[in-house]
Amino acid sequence: MLFRSVWDETQWDREIHKAVKTLIHLRRTRTVLQRGRYEPAVVTPGGLFGYTRTLQDERMLILFNRTEQLQHISLPVDPQYRGHWRTVYPHEGTVANVGERWNLALPPKMGMIWEWSGR
């Protein structure tokens, strides 16, 4: 066979499949990810990329580490968005209490998403 069938589920990478399903679900259930204002948060030549999406009082931070190494980053935080941020991807529930700066460690080849949950 010249091309393998993408419909053959035995050939799927289950980890990627699960991640894509989770990201699709997040986008469908979070209006801020559909219509929120886009603002770049960080772009580095070394492979870090991030942005925020804001809609009324909702805000999400999306960060990607495209490098092969753990990356540390320190982001300034707007006064109105200081307080509690909760991870929503790749796992849900971890809460960070954020002040003037947010110091983060991003695993290699990983994307992470946080949701502002108030003060």
Model-derived features: positions:
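Carbohydrate-interacting/catalytic domains
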Residues: 1-119
